């Protein structure tokens, strides 16, 4: 039986890409019976009834799965944040990073609209970028008005499945339009009333850009830590994870425990205060989370 990857799911149909093209498939009834929903990004076995139509027979095990957006087997996330309009927001970036790290997806931080900043804001954003690079993250500067800066992103998209996510109104769709102009994805300017952009993408689809596949997603419509526990959180902050191995107590939450290596690293300036502050805020959110039944 032929195998392929689901690149689009729409109205009960799954569009499976394979060596000979794309086949529009339906799911077998056994999926509903077993409560399995094929997702964009799934590697599947399918049966072709004719050159253009068929059925999905089997879904292979997933290495990861996101709920919002509904996509599986993601290799990396391009987290797009703007320098201005809206202003760069490290607190929101850290929230995205935690969610991405928790799902074992490699993050690439992409800061857009650098052509719109004044010198003061440029220095501020570059300082943040240097902090994140020291934590081990890749950080890129882009502008949709210069193709050269977008070209910097292209090598990161090769031979992998990427999710584009980030704050609304930062230019995610505009960036993909520059990478592949024939997409003609809709874009929205910032709402003067709300001070943020309106999401312009409505379904998940994997789009070929070079040798890679990129999903233009709704940008994580939920940023709640639904499945993350306090003990997981340290591992979602690389610099906290590194320091925590030297804490005196196993299971240290890095809040009030004595001889905590993380708190010591903050005091010594090895961990930035804003990252530690965000960590503490996220711990509080998780502890106040209502239980699910």
UniProtKB/Swiss-Prot annotation:
Its cofactor is Zn(2+). Gene3D superfamilies: Nucleic acid-binding proteins (2.40.50.140), P-loop containing nucleotide triphosphate hydrolases (3.40.50.300), Probable gtpase engc, domain 3 (1.10.40.50). Residues 63-223 form the CP-type G domain. Its EC number is 3.6.1.-. GTP binds at residues 112-115, 166-174. Zn(2+) binds at residues 247, 252, 254, 260. Disulfide bonds: none annotated. Keywords: Cytoplasm, GTP-binding, Hydrolase, Metal-binding, Nucleotide-binding, Ribosome biogenesis, RNA-binding, rRNA-binding, Zinc. Its main location: cytoplasm. GO terms for molecular function: GTP binding; GTPase activity; metal ion binding; rRNA binding. SUPFAM superfamilies: Nucleic acid-binding proteins (SSF50249), P-loop containing nucleoside triphosphate hydrolases (SSF52540). It is found in: Cytoplasm. InterPro entries: G_CP_dom, NA-bd_OB-fold, P-loop_NTPase, Ribosome_biogen_GTPase_RsgA, RsgA_GTPase_dom, RsgA_N. Belongs to the TRAFAC class YlqF/YawG GTPase family. RsgA subfamily. Monomer. Associates with 30S ribosomal subunit, binds 16S rRNA. PANTHER family: SMALL RIBOSOMAL SUBUNIT BIOGENESIS GTPASE RSGA, SMALL RIBOSOMAL SUBUNIT BIOGENESIS GTPASE RSGA 1, MITOCHONDRIAL-RELATED. One of several proteins that assist in the late maturation steps of the functional core of the 30S ribosomal subunit. Helps release RbfA from mature subunits. May play a role in the assembly of ribosomal proteins into the subunit. Circularly permuted GTPase that catalyzes slow GTP hydrolysis, GTPase activity is stimulated by the 30S ribosomal subunit. HAMAP family: GTPase_RsgA. This is Small ribosomal subunit biogenesis GTPase RsgA. It comes from Bacillus cereus (strain ATCC 14579 / DSM 31 / CCUG 7414 / JCM 2152 / NBRC 15305 / NCIMB 9373 / NCTC 2599 / NRRL B-3711).
